[in-house]
């Protein structure tokens, strides 16, 4: 576990040893009890050749350490090293470039003075980096028996009505892809952002899953950090576990996200829309993202890499595809109701839209499909020709830009000769470009939890289809009532359509009488056998209700942009991409103005084999649609008070445990199935992926001599170990666009890469593809020069701004003020202070400006700041943009005669 790496003072006592020595010893037996492997331990003390058994037997290796004071020992199966004196795992590293001449005879370690090398960028751009033994991270399924019994069963203490947090943390902790990332790639939990939630979460996971774990821990640091950012969780009142999950995952994503730059050609046939204001019709309301599809900016502009092609017949005749689509469409009324019911989620959340980018494009063809891609704060609306659905093209728009407001390009004159040549003038946002760069962000959170939904609305008059892509992190499913179940179960008929606003039993408007009757009904239901009331609600029923098709007619007609009228329509919804871990939220709570209610209906859910094939889009590339349950969060009590617990399956021994704050108890599968589920975590199931991991694990024992060694991303290896579909090998997280290591990552390159033997690389590459192949690590000289230029630019811009602003503050009565958007200024400030690596785009004052009588004035209540004319000219000469928003203080004209009269009166008064 790389997360436990630290300096061990006993490393100096290790003798010289080779892999061949360890392999030979692994075929032997314990020198005391003659027990053979696996899991024998070899002493690493210099000139000591002792081999003993582990805790699964008599544990002679520990006895040997106590008697001889030989503290370091290596497991001959996993090649992990343990220090008895430090009671922790240690790592034996060596430097790059010092490989022996015979690649098949390599020392397992070359000890460094401080355990981990401190990086400085050398002048010859040769990267010296410790090499972590690959065996530390590719022991896929080999674990010691003592670890199987102990790890991951640590409770969490309640620190004041925090059972909601404890249950959520335990549920996440038992999601192997996320937990293994923090345990195996802990060095990547780096952030300069406060309150550094990822570091607190890393510390918590280390405590929960450490071999020497305590009975329970107190998650104080993590909780304090979340309360600092989100005031919803301050105080000691009971909160919602689902809200906490969303907040935590959003924070982790923000701190761990990495930007991926993509360059696209701008087809000249696509024209940018001038404004989005003209499109605020009823269809815009229809496409508002529901709470269940609360997208993060984690995978912004993912449409660039995700195909959602549909052939012409399927797209144009969507309404006729009844047999396969009758239960795979979502009710748009439920979308709006979702937002209303869960409005509380958005009130306490963070500013999640700072990475959102609005893009719009039009193809002026007769038959087009409107594609609307949702982000947190903006919608992506594109008209795509039916024949081009397989390759959607997106173009930046000037959303919200008033065409009457001018945005000036950078001034051509060199107003600031002192600026270095790195201050290249940027192009105006409105100027045409041949190529553009999309800002796309990814993190371990988006890799694991993000999926994509396709919503389609078809006009029944002109057959025009509007397609909406939404990125979801969880699915919020309604719990259907008895009448809704009957409709769902009878929907096999092609024309059977679930009415808008279904699941009325759960979400119909309630008054005080209905509220009282609901409680009476629940009491009666609890006293009468379930067979008396009808069929049991299953998770498949909830999914079918969520994806049910909806007929848009009457008061709920569809505003067709082609017909320019309200028309009858039909809406469908399917999943384009399933996430590796599917988070399902059952909507048990309904919040009204004066009171809240809870739906206590039992929902039956499978522990294994959840089949989501009926809800998958036809053209989806997803191959695995079967899920197994990992954990479930349960709520006991009413809407106003109650208690949260979690049932989790331990990934090491496949047993189920109940996590009730600091109490951890083993339970049966029937106990889990009878639970009142609130949030469920399902993981993709793939026997083929498990076989592939076992095959690669077996190859480690072959030890074929090779002349080349390959470097591979730790993050991708974590995917290979824990994902059902890891995807192509991606080494871009430690490489720049030039193929070298970025200078800023040189200091911790050992946390990013591992060295693979050639036979392992060949097998992985032939199976998954991707790359690029890397045999040599070096610091990129080009990036180093660019980084130095950027740093010099930051320093120069900051110094000039401070000087100009100081002069502006000393002015008594400036004649003019220039207003600047604080949103843009904050981005610029983050850049010059080194918090953001990329400079901001052109100055964008469109949100603070308004045009009246042909003059550009400041919008009332706008988020703006005031700077001097010199400061404006300085920033505008570098970044361009606009428009200019100028404030001129009113000038008071004083009558000279009145002034003389006042002076005369003052003189006479003094004389008296």
Curated annotation (Swiss-Prot):
Query: Domain USP spans what residues?
Result: 154-685
Q: Where are the zinc fingers (UBP-type)?
A: 6-109
- What residues sit in the active site? 163, 643
Ranges for domain DUSP come to 687-780, 788-891
The record's CDD domains line, in alphabetical order, gives:
Peptidase_C19R
Please list the residues that bind Zn(2+) 2. 30, 33, 53, 60
The GO biological-process annotations, alphabetized, read as:
axon guidance; cell migration; centrosome duplication; endocytosis; nervous system development; protein deubiquitination; protein K48-linked deubiquitination; protein K63-linked deubiquitination
Q: Which SUPFAM superfamilies match?
A: Cysteine proteinases (SSF54001), DUSP-like (SSF143791), RING/U-box (SSF57850)
Molecular function (GO) terms for this protein are: cysteine-type deubiquitinase activity; cysteine-type endopeptidase activity; zinc ion binding
Q: How is it modified post-translationally?
A: Ubiquitinated via a VHL-dependent pathway for proteasomal degradation.
What's its catalytic activity? Thiol-dependent hydrolysis of ester, thioester, amide, peptide and isopeptide bonds formed by the C-terminal Gly of ubiquitin (a 76-residue protein attached to proteins as an intracellular targeting signal)
PANTHER family found in the cross-reference section: UBIQUITIN CARBOXYL-TERMINAL HYDROLASE, UBIQUITIN CARBOXYL-TERMINAL HYDROLASE 33
Is this entry keyworded Metal-binding? Answer: yes
Give the UniProt family note. Answer: Belongs to the peptidase C19 family. USP20/USP33 subfamily.
Principal place where this protein is found?
cytoplasm
- For this entry, the protein name equals Ubiquitin carboxyl-terminal hydrolase 33
Question: GO CC terms on record?
Answer: centrosome; perinuclear region of cytoplasm
Q: Which InterPro entries would you find in this protein's record?
A: DUSP-like_sf (IPR035927), Papain-like_cys_pep_sf (IPR038765), Pept_C19_DUSP (IPR006615), Peptidase_C19_UCH (IPR001394), Ub_carboxyl-term_hydrolase (IPR050185), USP_CS (IPR018200), USP_dom (IPR028889), Znf_RING/FYVE/PHD (IPR013083)
Q: What is the lineage of its organism?
A: Eukaryota, Metazoa, Chordata, Craniata, Vertebrata
């Amino acid at each position: 576990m790389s997360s436990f790496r630290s300096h061990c003072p006993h490393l100096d006592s290790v003798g010289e040893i080779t892999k061949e020595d360890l392999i030979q010893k692994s075929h032997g037996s314990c020198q005391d009890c003659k027990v053979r492997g696996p899991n024998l331990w070899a002493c690493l003390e210099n000139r000591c050749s002792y081999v003993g058994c582990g805790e699964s037997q008599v544990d002679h290796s520990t006895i040997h350490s106590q008697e001889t004071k030989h503290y370091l020992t290596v497991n001959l199966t996993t090649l992990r090293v343990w220090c008895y004196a430090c009671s922790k795992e240690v790592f034996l590293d060596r430097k790059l470039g010092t490989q022996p001449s015979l690649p098949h005879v390599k020392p397992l370690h070359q000890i460094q003075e401080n355990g981990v090398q401190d990086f400085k960028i050398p002048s010859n751009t040769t990267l010296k980096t410790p090499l972590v033994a690959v065996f530390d991270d590719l022991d896929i399924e080999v674990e010691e028996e003592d670890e199987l019994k102990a790890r991951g069963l640590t409770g969490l203490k309640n620190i004041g009505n925090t059972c909601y947090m404890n249950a959520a943390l335990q549920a996440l902790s038992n999601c192997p892809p996320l937990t293994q990332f923090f345990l195996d790639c802990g060095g990547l939990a780096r952030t300069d952002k406060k309150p550094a939630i990822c570091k607190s979460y890393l510390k918590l996971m280390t405590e929960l899953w450490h071999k020497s774990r305590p009975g329970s821990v107190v998650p104080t640091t993590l909780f304090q950090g979340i309360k600092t950012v989100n005031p919803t969780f301050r105080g000691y009142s009971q909160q919602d576990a689902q809200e906490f999950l969303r907040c935590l995952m959003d924070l982790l994503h923000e701190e761990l996200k990495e930007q991926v730059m993509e360059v696209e050609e701008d087809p000249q046939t696509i024209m940018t829309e001038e404004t989005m204001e003209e499109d605020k019709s009823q269809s815009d309301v229809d496409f508002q993202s529901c709470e269940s599809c609360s997208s993060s900016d984690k995978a912004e502009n993912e449409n660039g890499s995700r195909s959602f092609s549909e052939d012409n017949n399927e797209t144009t005749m969507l309404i006729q595809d009844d047999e396969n689509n009758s239960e795979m469409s979502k009710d748009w009324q439920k979308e709006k109701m979702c937002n209303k019911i869960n409005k509380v989620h958005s009130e306490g959340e963070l500013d999640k839209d700072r990475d959102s980018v609005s893009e719009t494009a039009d193809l002026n063809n007769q038959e087009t499909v409107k594609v609307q891609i949702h982000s947190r704060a903006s919608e992506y609306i594109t008209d795509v020709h039916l024949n081009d659905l397989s390759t959607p093209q997106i173009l930046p728009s000037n959303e919200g830009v008033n065409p009457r407001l001018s945005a000036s390009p950078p001034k051509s004159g060199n107003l600031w000769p002192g600026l270095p040549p790195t201050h290249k003038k940027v192009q105006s946002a409105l100027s045409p470009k041949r190529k553009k760069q999309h800002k796309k962000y990814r993190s371990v959170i988006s890799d694991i939890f993000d999926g994509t939904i396709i919503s389609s609305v078809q006009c029944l008059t002109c057959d025009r289809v509007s397609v909406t892509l939404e990125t979801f992190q969880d699915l919020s499913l309604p719990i259907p009532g008895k009448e809704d179940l009957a409709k769902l179960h009878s929907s096999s008929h092609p024309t059977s359509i679930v009415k808008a606003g279904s699941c009325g039993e759960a979400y119909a408007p309630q008054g005080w009488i209905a509220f009282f009757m609901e409680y009476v009904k629940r009491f009666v239901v609890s006293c009468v056998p379930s067979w008396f009331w009808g069929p049991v609600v299953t998770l498949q029923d909830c999914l079918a209700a969520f994806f049910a098709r909806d007929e848009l007619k009457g008061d709920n007609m569809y505003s067709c942009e082609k017909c320019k009228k309200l028309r009858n329509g039909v809406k469908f919804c399917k999943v384009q991409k399933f996430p590796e871990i599917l988070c399902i939220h059952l909507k048990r709570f309904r919040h009204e103005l004066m009171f809240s209610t809870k739906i206590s209906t039992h929902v039956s859910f499978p522990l294994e084999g959840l089949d989501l094939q009926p809800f998958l889009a036809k053209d989806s590339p997803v191959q695995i649609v079967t899920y197994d349950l990992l954990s479930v969060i349960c709520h006991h009590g009413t809407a106003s008070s109650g208690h949260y617990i979690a049932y989790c399956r331990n990934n090491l021994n496949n047993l189920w445990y109940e996590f009730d704050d600091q109490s951890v108890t083993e339970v049966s599968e029937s106990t889990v199935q009878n639970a009142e589920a609130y949030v469920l975590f399902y993981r993709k199931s793939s026997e083929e992926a498990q076989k592939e991991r076992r095959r690669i694990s077996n190859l480690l024992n072959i030890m074929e001599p090779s002349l080349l060694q390959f470097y591979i991303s730790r993050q991708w290896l974590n995917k290979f170990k824990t994902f059902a579909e890891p995807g192509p090998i991606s080494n871009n997280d430690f490489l720049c666009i030039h193929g070298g290591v970025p200078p800023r990552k040189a200091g911790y390159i050992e946390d990013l890469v591992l060295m693979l033997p050639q036979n392992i690389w060949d097998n992985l590459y032939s199976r998954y593809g991707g790359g690029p192949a890397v045999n040599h690590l070096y610091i990129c000289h080009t990036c180093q020069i660019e980084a130095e230029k950027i740093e010099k630019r930051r320093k120069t811009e900051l110094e000039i701004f401070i000087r100009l602003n100081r002069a502006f503050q000393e002015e008594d009565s400036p004649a003019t003020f220039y207003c600047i958007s604080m949103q843009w200024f904050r981005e610029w400030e983050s850049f010059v202070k080194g918090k953001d690596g990329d400079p901001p785009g052109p100055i964008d004052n469109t949100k603070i400006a308004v045009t009246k009588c042909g003059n550009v004035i400041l919008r009332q209540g706008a988020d703006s700041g005031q700077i001097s004319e010199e400061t404006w000219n300085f920033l505008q000469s570098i970044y361009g943009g606009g428009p200019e928003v100028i404030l001129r203080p009113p000038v008071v004209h004083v009558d000279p005669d009145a002034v003389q009269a006042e002076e005369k009166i003052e003189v006479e008064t003094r004389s008296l």
